[in-house]
């Protein structure tokens, strides 16, 4: 049995979209950790941050993520900040093949400019928030087994690149 595949990277980079496509092609189950959390708590991630705080969210995220990684035959889309958690990161690196989806901030900003569902984008100037978050996370994201530069690639090409690396390693 092959290892699970995890996708990490900034919010809005396309982890869920790419993950769904990969899971379909590889006949694996797709799991979006944020969606599981929302379903279990019956609140959006945004509302969880507002009502219960980031610390509560991160602890819940850790439990859900570790639980999902232990299951078999999964393509797992991690929350944007999940890889910052040492337990999640180390467990993912030991038990999955991990891919960092990387997209330049200008393109990321275009994707997120009208989003109301991103709890860490609090300023009117999304670019400043993104730069700050990216600076805090990029070194940690780089621990992933593979870095996939998504800048000029269509989703289908990103999917093919990841599947090729996943199957040939």
Give the role of each language-model region.
Residues 10:
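P-loop (Walker A) phosphate-binding loop of NTP-binding proteins
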Residues 16:
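Walker A/P-loop
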Residues 92-115, 148:
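Conserved phosphate-donor/acceptor-positioning beta-strand/loop module used by diverse small-molecule
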């Amino acid at each position: 049995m092959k290892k699970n595949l995890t996708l990490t990277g900034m919010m809005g980079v396309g982890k869920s979209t790419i993950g769904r496509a990969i899971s379909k092609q590889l006949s694996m189950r797709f799991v979006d950790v944020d969606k599981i959390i929302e379903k279990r708590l019956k609140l959006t991630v945004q509302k969880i941050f507002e009502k219960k705080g980031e610390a509560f969210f991160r602890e819940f995220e850790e439990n859900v993520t570790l639980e999902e990684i232990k299951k078999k035959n999964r393509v797992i889309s991690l929350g944007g900040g999940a890889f910052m958690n040492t337990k999640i990161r180390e467990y993912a690196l030991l038990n999955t093949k991990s891919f960092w989806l990387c997209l330049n901030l200008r393109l990321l900003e275009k994707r997120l400019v009208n989003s109301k569902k991103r709890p860490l984008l609090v300023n009117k100037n999304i670019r400043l928030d993104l730069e700050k978050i990216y600076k805090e996370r990029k070194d940690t994201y780089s621990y992933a087994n593979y870095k996939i530069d998504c800048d000029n690639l269509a989703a289908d090409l990103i999917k093919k690149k990841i599947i090729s690396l996943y199957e040939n390693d």
